[in-house]
């Protein structure tokens, strides 16, 4: 009888599922889905943060037609300039030659100043501040070059005479004597050269004799200078 009661009691026992067991998902399945969603969000953010590549603009190809047109225009301008010069009178041609010479001289002076390291904004002779012997030599070369640009003027000889006198005022008697000796030597050499050039028959195509000085290397840029300018630099 007791066995029957125990069997009945066992058969009436009902195991009720807990709240967690009522969910139709495996343990940890919700966590997996949350992790998956977070991964997807991170991938989307990375895609948004990736910089967009911009293609470099293609280099323009040279326009052959434009290049040919520019060359033709330059050629026509050169021909027109040559025709203009050809139609000038002798006096106008001389004036044009002097104009171009002045332009070239200004360019040469600029190059000479750059070679001497003259970079001051004031420019010109005011930029020099000579202290050493070499610096005074460079300053004298530039000053002589500048002055010699006016050598064709009828007033140039008197100008040089006045300039030498005003410079010698600040010298001692011994220094003035040295200047005087150099001028006398220069005068003697000039007389010899003038006589030699006067004796040569004209029309043989030989150049006249010129006087060379030790400053020729320094004043090599003075391609428009004459003998007097070079000699003047020597005794200055």
UniProtKB/Swiss-Prot annotation:
Chain positions covered by the region annotation Disordered: 1-84
Main location: cytoplasm
GO MF terms, alphabetically ordered: translation initiation factor activity
Any one GO CC term of the record: eukaryotic 43S preinitiation complex
Feature: compositional bias, Acidic residues: 28-46
Subcellular location, record wording: Cytoplasm
Pfam families (alphabetical): eIF3_subunit
Biased composition regions of type Basic and acidic residues, renumbered to the chain: 47-58, 68-77
Keywords noted in UniProt: Cytoplasm, Initiation factor, Protein biosynthesis
Domain of life (superkingdom): Eukaryota
Self-association and partners: Component of the eukaryotic translation initiation factor 3 (eIF-3) complex. The eIF-3 complex interacts with pix.
Family according to the record: Belongs to the eIF-3 subunit J family.
Function: Component of the eukaryotic translation initiation factor 3 (eIF-3) complex, which is involved in protein synthesis of a specialized repertoire of mRNAs and, together with other initiation factors, stimulates binding of mRNA and methionyl-tRNAi to the 40S ribosome. The eIF-3 complex specifically targets and initiates translation of a subset of mRNAs involved in cell proliferation.
Name recorded for this polypeptide: Eukaryotic translation initiation factor 3 subunit J
Organism: Drosophila yakuba (Fruit fly)
Taxonomic lineage from the root: Eukaryota, Metazoa, Ecdysozoa, Arthropoda, Hexapoda
